[in-house]
Amino acid sequence: RALHQRGIWFCPASGRQYTSLRKLFAPVADCCVFLCENGGVIYKDEQCIAKNPMPRALAEEIANDLWTRSDGQGEVMLSGQNTAYLMERGLGMLKRIQFIGNNYQIIHDPSEVPEEITKVSVYLHEGVESYTERFVPRWKEANCAVAGPYWIDTTFANKGIGVRSICKTLDIDLADVMAFGDNYNDVSMLDIVGVPYIMDGAAAPLREKYPNHTPRPEDVLREFLKQN
């Protein structure tokens, strides 16, 4: 809210769905622009202002591959504009989606998704380590990246594309943007903004790539507000 009072937009940038993100930031949601689904969907003032869907045939092919080549350990989520379509095996994905507050629907085949697909993800309840090399190089054309300890994402958008869309819409210079990231799916965003920060807990190659480190974004933002 203090940022907004100074004319600065705060933008949660996440792989999460809009409904989940808005609930998470409910007290200040009207002061935010929401970069959802890793840049696949952008919301402002409760309206979708930009969307970057995947080619339908490719999205379905990726979903089937993630499902069949994850050794019975992977559960697949296909993201629409504001609904998650779940191919689940009872291994924990559904409980996680319910916990974070997503709108969701259970499906049995990617062809059942009734809208444009913005992201395809696999949830690996034992962790992504054994599957990173299996999926990330294969689906590089769809920006395949590790998105946390249990998730691998594919999308034709990325956080960088999302940030560019926001800056164009709100007439903001990328050089005036500060961004915080902690994983490889943040690189496209961190590489284009004027002031990128990497979190202290990020992987070593990311900490080496970016000189600005912090344990908490709040610390940096409080200092920024003091000086501005």
Enumerate the predicted regions with their spans.
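Hydrophobic residues within well-ordered alpha-helices
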Residues: L3, N38, V163, M189-L190
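Active-site phosphate-binding/coordination module
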Residues: R1-G92
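Short loop/helix-cap segments at secondary-structure boundaries that form the rim of catalytic
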Residues: F25-V28, D45, T132-P137, M189-D191, ...
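Short active-site oxyanion
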Residues: R6-C11, D30-C32, T118-V120, A175-V177, ...
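Conserved acidic, metal-coordinating active-site core of Asp-based
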Residues: R69-F180, D186-M189, G201
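Asp-based, Mg2+/Mn2+-dependent phosphohydrolase catalytic module
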Residues: D173, I192, P196-N228
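Phosphate- and divalent-cation-binding pockets in alpha/beta enzyme and binding domains
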Residues: S20-K23, S130-Y131, G162, S188-M189, ...
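Short hydrophobic/aromatic-enriched beta-strand-loop microsegments
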Residues: C31-E37, N52, I97-Q98, C144-A145, ...
